[in-house]
Swiss-Prot record:
InterPro entries: P-loop_NTPase (IPR027417), Shikimate/glucono_kinase (IPR031322), Shikimate_kinase/TSH1 (IPR000623), Shikimate_kinase_CS (IPR023000)
Enzyme class of the recorded protein, top EC level: transferase
Species for this entry: Baumannia cicadellinicola subsp. Homalodisca coagulata
Protein name: Shikimate kinase
Stored CDD domains: SK
Subunit: Monomer.
SUPFAM superfamilies the UniProt entry points to: P-loop containing nucleoside triphosphate hydrolases
Known role: Catalyzes the specific phosphorylation of the 3-hydroxyl group of shikimic acid using ATP as a cosubstrate.
């Protein structure tokens, strides 16, 4: 059985962090949090609005604060925003306060999973989504890899199967 330590999911948008996180929390009987949903709950506005009004820097500041507060809890599963790892403080907190699981996925899968989602501010630009996702991957993948304790390829399997694989890996560590 997996001890109740914090589990933090990182990775790009469309990797399945929220869906897999809910499955993990359910299977492990742990509390689930999504940093984007917490920001929306605290601001009373959706992420797109926060981006529009405060810009990416304002959003990242809120995100850093929310993740700091959530990672102080014990025995949680936390799905983080794809860009949360841009903050060194957030990377340090995630590494120090739990097991960091990097959900890696292909650009193709990201495109499929995000194409109808209008809540992704970084994909609302005039630049084609593929180019945006490729640029984000070049910038962020090294940061995900830097702090990951476990890396899982989250492409074809269901969230339930990926959660099962994560639990198996946690039991071995």
């Amino acid at each position: 059985m997996v001890e109740k330590r914090n589990i933090f999911l990182i990775g790009p948008m469309g990797a399945g962090k929220s869906t897999i996180g809910r499955q993990l929390a359910q299977q492990l009987n742990m509390e689930f949090f999504d940093s984007d949903q917490e920001i929306e709950r605290l601001t009373g506005a959706d992420i797109g609005w926060v981006f529009d009004v405060e810009g990416e820097d304002g959003f990242r500041s809120r995100e850093e604060k929310v993740i700091n507060e959530l990672t102080e809890k014990q025995g949680i599963v936390l799905a983080t925003g794809g860009g949360s790892i841009k903050s060194r403080e957030t990377r340090n907190r995630l590494s120090a306060r739990g097991v960091v699981i990097y959900l890696d996925t292909t650009i193709e899968k990201q495109l499929v999973r995000t194409k109808r989602d209008k809540k992704r501010p970084l994909l609302q630009a005039k630049i084609p989504s593929r180019e945006v996702l490729e640029a984000l991957a070049r910038e962020r993948n090294p940061l995900y890899e830097e702090i990951a304790d476990i890396t899982i390829r989250a492409n074809e399997q269901s969230a339930k199967v990926v959660a099962y694989h994560i639990i198996s890996m946690l039991e071995r560590n």
